[in-house]
Regions:
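C-terminal ends of transmembrane helices
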Residues: 108-109, 153-164, 209-222
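Core alpha-helical transmembrane segments of integral membrane proteins
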Residues: 114-187, 191-192
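Soluble N-terminal domains of membrane-associated systems
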Residues: 1-97
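Generic detector of multi-pass transmembrane helix bundles and their immediately adjacent loops
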Residues: 185-251
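Alpha-helical transmembrane segments and their cytosolic membrane-interface
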Residues: 74-142, 228-239, 251
Length: 251
């Protein structure tokens, strides 16, 4: 069996898992399963994953080889693809597919569209943002304003993150969403400015980053856990600065 194919399989799977939001321990475990299941040539595997890189050391009959891959580019939360990759590792382990089939399927997974289309994502942002305004004591009209603010914030982030670092994308989106809420209040359409602001920034909150950070820390992956926690902290700081700036501009 071609050792280069095994390396390609492992790095491809790890890269996708990291970009689609899997936690560190899951990525390391899946890469190890792929390597061991790929053929009897692999005797021992060591894997170390950080939020921006993958390090794998693989021992075979002819020696030990270590490789690393830097993971860059945009990251999109898609737990459906994470689940598909994990399922593929089990299929390879049980002998249901070959290494070449697994590589082909990984490429198909990577190129496949997201499980939820853009209109569905927009609808979800609107419902979650609008519903949160009601939970916090807003009225029916606040639901509409919160939904519009959430859509503005989410779609602006999705568009600007292609051109600027995520921190600035979140900062700009939070500012626009907050200014929209301030404008609604200034024009007299609603007296629940704070509630609408909270609804507007809801899609931007770093919930998954915080969750993965805690899971990594509890699993002993301190470097990845601290890095993900710092990422979540900077995102929260960007949101806070934007909201404070919007409120200060209205006074």
């Amino acid at each position: 069996m071609d050792e280069e194919q095994i390396w390609r399989l492992c790095m491809l799977a790890g890269n996708q898992l990291l970009r689609y939001g899997a936690e560190t321990s899951r990525i390391e475990e899946t890469i190890t399963h792929f390597a061991v299941s790929a053929g009897i040539q692999v005797e021992h595997v060591q894997c170390f994953v950080t939020p921006t890189g993958i390090f794998v050391s693989m021992s075979t009959a002819i020696g030990t080889t270590t490789r690393l891959e830097r993971v860059t580019g945009s990251r999109i939360l898609d737990l459906d693809k994470v689940t598909q990759i994990n399922s593929l590792s089990r299929q390879l382990q049980s002998g249901e597919c070959s290494i070449n089939d697994a590589i082909d399927q990984l490429e198909q997974i990577d190129n496949a569209p997201l499980l939820y289309s853009l209109p569905v994502q927009i609808l979800a942002a609107a419902l979650s943002s609008g519903s949160f305004t009601i939970i916090l004591g807003g009225k029916g009209t606040d639901f509409i304003y919160g939904a519009i603010g959430g859509i503005l914030a989410q779609e602006l982030t999705r568009w600007t993150v292609r051109f600027v670092p995520r921190f600035f994308a979140v900062l700009l989106a939070s500012l626009v969403g907050s200014l929209f809420a301030v404008l609604i209040s200034v024009l007299g359409f609603s007296h629940h400015e704070g509630v609408i602001i909270i609804g507007a920034i809801l899609p931007l909150l770093p919930g998954l980053a915080v969750t993965n950070s805690i899971r990594d820390l509890l699993a002993g992956d301190l470097l990845a856990g601290v890095a993900r926690g710092a990422e979540a902290l900077f995102t929260a700081a960007a949101i806070a600065v934007a909201v404070a700036l919007a409120i200060s501009l209205s006074t």
